[in-house]
Amino acid sequence: FRWQGWAYDDGLGGACRNENGKNLYVVNVDRDIFVFDAGLKYDNDLNLGIDYIIPNFDYLIKNKKNIKGIFLTHGHESNIGAVPDILEQIPSIPVYGTKLTLEMLKNDLEPEQLKKANLKEIKAHTKINFGKNSIFPISVTHSIPDAVCFVLYTPDGAIVYTGDFVFDATMQGAYKTDIGKLAYVGKQGVLCLMAESFYAEKEGHTSPSNRVAGFIREVLAKNPNRIIATIFPAHFYRIQEMFNEVSKTHRKIVIMGKGLQDMINKAVDEGYLSVDKSRIGTLSDLENKDTVILISDEKEKPFNNLDRIIKGYDKYIKIKETDTIFITEPAYPGIEKRSALIMDEIAMLGANAVSLSSKKHLLHHASREDLMLMINLMNPKYYFPVKGEYRNQYANAEVAEQIGIPRENIILKENGDVAEFIKGKLTDSKEHIEVDQILIDGKSQGDIGDLVLKDREMLGENGIVIISCTLDKQTKDILGGPEILTRGFVYVKESQDL
């Protein structure tokens, strides 16, 4: 958003077609730049060696002197995953987040980055002043504690960035939405509401489909033998549900991987998880039929740990036909193909595979009724659907129009587009900032350009032929060879004529 008393919003990521993940929104108020979230997304094609994708932040580098900070809504990778890459380029940029959000971010930072990082812990409902502008975080319900939305107060009105949220009256403590604070902000006047679109096509409220304790209970009851359960480390609510249900049985949970163990222990110490430690087993319990083995997924390679176990590479766990493999999350955008392949591989081993259905079980994102409630609380003059694919954003726009926001006050944008406001009114801005995406290869830890990807694609489709020989340096006579080496071209034993 640009004000003259100006502000603009530029979606460097998360604002265009096929854009689940890599969220990054820039709000520029009289040259004061506020960045909301900086996340990654996964490559859904399972090829070309790409681990994950982040937004191009050349614009931020160019304008780094004007950046007031990066404001993180919560600790999921779609919202914090690009921060380490930004800090590589702009080490001093202030990063604001709640206690747990910053703890999750610290896990992604290299030791040298952590020393230099300018991390600023915030508390919900405590205003942060930046001259004539200010930021006010409000607690919201998501699958991780300490999630917030942000209200950016400007001279011409408030911009509200919801982040990811649901309305669920059963949630308490660090998961609870402060509806009173949201309503108070709405009464003061909201110029523009930026609301997520992930489930905008789904009717009703997301709750109670975001809670799966009953399904976990059913899996535990129907499968008396050993269960190997995958869990996303940042989905604290699901981890809590798992521990709650296991504690009602005679089973023990064995937590595999030091990273997951450390995270759970720290979360328990900080009060974000409640765990009966007598239910936590050790490696000696791995072979017991009534054990639940908890394994985590890694950032760069979803299902990587489970894949290692399936292929027999794991030192401690070998899958048996009596085992049940329990995928505790519905496949989210970006990993659908990999999830389907994993389920096939489990079936080939003869083990039982159980997963959450994306039709019956929902993630903690706002459905249509949640969006309607948020819009009614905020009563914004302008509405800006963000996150999700374009069809989700279009559905979100329809929700807003359905409850009374004029069509001309609903903003649909592509990555790099600018929504400009002058003295509180949306202008017909044609400005566009050139942005693209950065493809990260975990091996090289750098941006993989289009030319490299094209070469990889050609090699994958056509193979390679290498001709080598040894030459005399002075006479250029052939001393040895030539030798022909092929990979992925033809099967040599059956192609002697060639």
Locations of regions flagged by a protein language model:
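Hard-cation-handling environments
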Residues: 201-328, 332-379, 384-498
